[in-house]
């Protein structure tokens, strides 16, 4: 049986940087907190917990004083930085550069009032800032925070009809969303916006993420069985897993090697192991080793 790990799977640049910063700080000693799960993968979070990383939420952050806190790749709204400064917290900012640039673009757009900037009706003339993303996702909360909570989040094409097409619309996207669906949303808004109103779209989807879709399709198509390894909280993982299943119905989502049902291997010649941008390489390696060392009963 041939078993292959997808070379393109594994941590994206932003996650790699965040984890490296955490490991460096932990190796230097002292207590380090992380605001939210550093990555949407329970096995990797547990590995870092054993190294000493303490995961906290925003309520915990309000109670901390003089601590050292790492901000993960997803980014945070301005209020988090203000609270940290108020509480004397030392921030280690691991926000992904792609997310950081997007935050700055949205903030700049929000602060620009169309026209001559005359006082009185600026709020009424401000265009709608729309973000294609998952409501409540950490990255999306950070993006909405750049607009003091005024940005409108659309989770899918079905949500777009509730926009006010009599006002200007500026469309952005969460960096890990589907490029295909983003284009469908663009087409819908173009078809419905009223004459004389401005619509501008900004393709802010991370290319490292977007390029994974065609790559994972091709990988899934050339194997009899696909083991997709990722945490079940990963938005990016769900998109990629669904894409694998569309190409290869013999695809299974697992969080670790312990979840492999070896009956799946019956009659299989080739197995492909792949994962999300939040899946550590070591976890896929363990799945490969589990398959290599598996001996069916009677063949030991």
Question: Where would I find each of the regions flagged by the language model?
Answer:
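The feature marks the mature, well-folded catalytic cores of soluble enzymes
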Residues: 1-300
């Amino acid at each position: 049986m041939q078993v292959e790990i997808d070379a393109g799977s594994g941590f994206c640049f932003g996650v790699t940087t965040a984890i490296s910063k955490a490991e460096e700080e932990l190796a230097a000693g002292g207590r380090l907190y992380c605001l939210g799960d550093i990555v949407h993968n329970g096995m990797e979070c547990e590995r870092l917990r054993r190294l000493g990383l303490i995961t906290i939420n925003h309520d915990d952050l309000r109670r901390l004083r003089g601590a050292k806190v790492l901000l993960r790749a997803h980014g945070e709204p301005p209020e988090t930085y203000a609270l940290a400064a108020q509480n004397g917290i030392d921030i280690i900012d691991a926000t992904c550069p792609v997310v950081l640039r997007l935050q700055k673009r949205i903030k700049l757009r929000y602060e620009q009032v169309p026209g001559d900037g005359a006082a009185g009706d600026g709020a009424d003339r401000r265009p709608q800032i729309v973000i294609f993303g998952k409501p409540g996702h950490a990255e999306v909360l950070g993006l909405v925070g750049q607009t003091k909570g005024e940005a409108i989040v659309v989770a899918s094409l079905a949500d777009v009809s509730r926009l006010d097409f009599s006002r200007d619309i500026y469309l952005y996207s969460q960096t890990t969303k589907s490029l295909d669906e983003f284009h469908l949303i663009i087409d819908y808004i173009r078809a419905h916006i009223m004459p004389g109103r401005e619509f501008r779209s900004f393709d802010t989807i991370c290319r490292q993420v977007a390029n994974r879709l065609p790559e994972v399709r091709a990988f899934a198509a050339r194997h009899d069985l696909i083991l997709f390894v990722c945490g079940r909280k990963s938005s990016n993982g769900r998109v990629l897993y669904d894409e694998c299943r569309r190409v290869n119905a013999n695809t299974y989502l697992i969080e670790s090697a312990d979840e492999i049902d070896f009956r799946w291997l019956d009659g299989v010649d080739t197995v492909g192991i792949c994962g999300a941008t939040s899946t550590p390489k070591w976890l896929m390696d363990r799945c490969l080793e589990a398959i290599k060392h598996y001996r069916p009963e009677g063949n030991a």
